[in-house]
Amino acid sequence: FFKALLFLGAGSVIIAMHHNENMWDMGGLRKRMPVTYATFLVGSLALAGIVPFAGFWSKDEVLYEALIHGLGTEGSLGTVFLAAYAMGLLAVLFTGFYTFRMVALTFHGEPRTDLAADPESVGWNVKGPLSVLGLLAATTGFLNLAPVKKLTGAKVDFLHQWLEGPEGAALMATLSAKHYKHLLHDVNPAHVTASELGPLLPAALSLGLAVTGALVAFRLYATPEPTEHTAKLGGLQDVLYNNYYQDEYQVWLATNVVQPLAGVADTVDQSLVDGVVDGVSSVSLSSG
């Protein structure tokens, strides 16, 4: 829900800004687009994995399972699980940062252009779906309460049971045994069980990283002049602003490497390959 909400919210902002998609030309839109702002904020909180919004539950469970299997698995496979957990935590930090950088630049501070100061009105044909998706993003995470079950012992994982069906657990066990036998033969979660570690500490860690990223983004970008600190980056600012010059590199690669190679291949194909084929055909025809 929250990803659809953010896409639709971005569309609402683009409509209001007369199809200007540059966040540096925005600012202060929360006062002029309150419905879009409120729903977009809900989607951003969910994407960043802030409790109790929908994204927190799915993100936390993935990280928790990676940690449990990493601590309970011997050898290199356990290291892989722990590396995945560490990369997941790093992604949590950066997701919180870039998500709320987007929120701060778009909706907070002061309008940085005339368009942002007087945006076009967006109708309820857009705001209505935004409101529905915002409500779902704020509430449906509670349907996935497996972490709460692990913490309290309450039988609240009905969504898992419904998705698996009456024979789902047995089917998944059969598939796992059949297809992942060699991969999982070293996994021994009994070394570190969920009851020993508990979900609260890992959840608090990931939540803390998400909040830290969000707060840093707000500190840097929810200001009247968010470009002041970026100017201190010097040449690095140009590299980042131009997306590491990936577009320019790909154009250079296509123009200076791919096209010449394609030309050589075409020449060889037409003159050598086709020439041999045509020559053999001509000899065959002339020899009767």
Where do the PLM segments sit?
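Alpha-helical transmembrane segments of polytopic integral membrane proteins
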Residues: 7-10, 19, 59-60, 96-100, ...
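Transmembrane-helix bundle segments that line or gate the permeation/cavity pathway
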Residues: 14-17, 46-56, 88-112, 137-151, ...
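Interfacial and helix-entry/exit segments of alpha-helical transmembrane bundles
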Residues: 15-53, 78-91, 114-140, 235-240
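Alpha-helical multi-pass transmembrane bundles of energy-transducing inner-membrane proteins
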Residues: 1-23
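Predominantly late transmembrane helices and immediately cytosolic-facing juxtamembrane segments
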Residues: 3, 7, 82-118, 145, ...
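Aromatic-capped, Gly/Pro-kinked transmembrane alpha-helices
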Residues: 147-205, 218-288
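Hydrophobic core segments of alpha-helical transmembrane domains in multi-pass membrane transport
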Residues: 44-48, 88, 92, 133-140, ...
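Flexible glycine/proline-rich, aromatic-decorated loop/lid segments
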Residues: 29-78, 108, 153-170
